Design a protein with these regions (language model features):
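A short, glycine-/small-residue-rich helix N-cap motif at loop->alpha-helix starts
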Residues: 2-11, 33, 119-120
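Short aromatic/hydrophobic "clamp" motif used to bind/position activated sugar donors
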Residues: 13, 25
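Short acidic donor-binding/metal-coordinating loop in glycosyltransferase active sites
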Residues: 16, 22, 30-32
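Active-site acidic short loop of glycosyltransferases
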Residues: 20-23, 36, 48-49, 111
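Conserved nucleotide-sugar donor-binding
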Residues: 21-23, 95-110
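Acidic donor-binding/catalytic loop of UDP-sugar-dependent glycosyltransferases
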Residues: 29-45
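Catalytic donor/gating beta->alpha subdomain of glycosyltransferases that bind UDP-sugars
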Residues: 47, 53-77, 104-107, 111-176
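Alpha-helical bilayer-embedded segments of polytopic membrane proteins, i.e.
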Residues: 168-196
Length: 196
């Protein structure tokens, strides 16, 4: 009966990881592309013998319109949170639009075993479970960036946000709680400025 709820995306990722010829795996998504031809070198260049995870950033370009500005702002805040947290030795998530980890690490943590029944979480929940301050590195250089295609419909963006929110309650540690508190305080600050 549990097989009914198995995420096809996670199954596809698992089969891909199993079939991979080399230990270092690098991921992006179909709606993203590297900004230049040095992306592979930049991301893989972050590995040392101790490194098992490399986190990168995927930008959302400066498209015209309020909706695109909102998405770009949200994407920037999310990136700042997870990358700065990892840089301060508290990694808690990654983003599948620009992410690398070792095949060995994937199987050491039994892949997506902890979240097979969830449709989302192939990137954030796995990194949340497997990352440590010792095994995680951030690469943020012009060569390491990817870029997401423009999102044209509110429903698509909302689905992405709901999907991410559905996995947040499974995060270990209290890093995400801190960032939720920070977001709430920022919202209250803006509301108080507007009210004055």
């Amino acid at each position: 009966s549990d097989a009914r709820y198995l995420s096809r995306r996670k199954l596809a990722f698992t089969l891909g990881v199993k079939a991979a010829k080399y230990d270092i795996l690098l991921f992006t998504e179909a709606n993203c592309q590297p900004l230049n031809d040095q992306w592979l070198s930049a991301m893989v260049g972050g590995y040392t013998p101790e490194t098992s995870i490399v986190l990168g950033y995927c930008k959302y370009s400066n498209y015209k319109g309020f909706f695109h500005k909102l998405i770009a702002y949200d994407n920037l805040l999310t990136g700042l949170r997870y990358l700065s947290s990892a840089l301060s030795h508290h990694p808690y998530i990654g983003n599948g639009r620009n992410l690398s980890y070792r095949k060995e690490l994937f199987f050491k943590h039994k892949g997506y075993c902890q979240s097979l029944n969830l449709h989302a979480g192939d990137d954030d929940l796995f990194i949340n479970e497997a990352s440590t301050k010792e095994n995680t590195k951030v690469i943020y250089t012009p060569d390491s960036l990817t870029e997401m295609d423009p999102i044209e419909r509110f429903g698509v963006w909302k689905e992405m946000k709901v999907s991410r929110a559905a996995t947040q309650r499974y995060y270990k540690g209290n890093t995400s709680t801190f960032y939720h508190l920070e977001s709430t305080c920022f919202f209250l600050f803006q509301a108080s400025v507007i009210a004055m």
